[in-house]
């Protein structure tokens, strides 16, 4: 059984179009609060049937602080903290993330950035070196759906996020009380 799962994951990794991290990433424009509007089916280590997911990123001298928050299916707040960093020789959107309680670090590749408004990127598409994980973050949920959703979906298709494990899954962001976290 485990062997079959590993084969499926291996095949899925090679049927995608190759994505690359962005060459330039201004971390000061990347920090702050993000609302997660899309995830993938494969990456459910922290997420399952969730809503109102946010990511708060801050800057320190050495790292980017990470606090991911969401509501589970019962409306309970779930959070996980950690940090992102550059491995030696990496730059741009080629980061690594380490989350508390998760045994291994993981690639965090920013593969596309939206336009800059008020000194912040409007949206971000994140994946990894195998194109298995997928996250779409936005600064403003309404503006994302009104202005950027079609372009992002086109990009996701071009990047190969169309398979069973990697097909984009919308995270509900309606009736959210973000003051809980």
Language model segments and positions:
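A beta-rich soluble binding module of mature secreted/lumenal proteins
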Residues: 3-4, 9-181
């Amino acid at each position: 059984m485990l062997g079959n799962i590993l084969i499926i994951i291996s095949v899925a990794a090679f049927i995608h179009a190759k994505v690359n991290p962005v060459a330039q990433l201004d971390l000061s424009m990347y920090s702050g609060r993000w609302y997660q509007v899309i995830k993938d089916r494969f990456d459910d280590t922290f997420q399952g049937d969730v809503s109102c997911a946010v990511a708060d990123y801050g800057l320190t001298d050495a790292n980017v602080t990470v606090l991911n928050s969401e509501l589970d299916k019962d409306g309970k707040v779930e959070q996980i903290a950690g940090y992102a960093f550059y491995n030696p020789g990496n730059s741009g959107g080629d980061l690594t993330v380490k989350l508390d309680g998760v045994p291994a670090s993981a690639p965090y590749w920013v593969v596309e950035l939206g336009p800059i408004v008020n000194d912040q990127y409007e949206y971000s598409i994140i994946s990894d070196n195998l194109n298995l994980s997928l996250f779409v973050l936005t600064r403003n949920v309404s503006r994302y759906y009104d202005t950027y959703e079609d372009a992002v979906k086109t990009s996701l298709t071009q990047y190969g996020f169309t398979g069973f494990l990697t097909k984009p899954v919308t995270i509900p962001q309606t009736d959210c009380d973000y003051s809980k976290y």
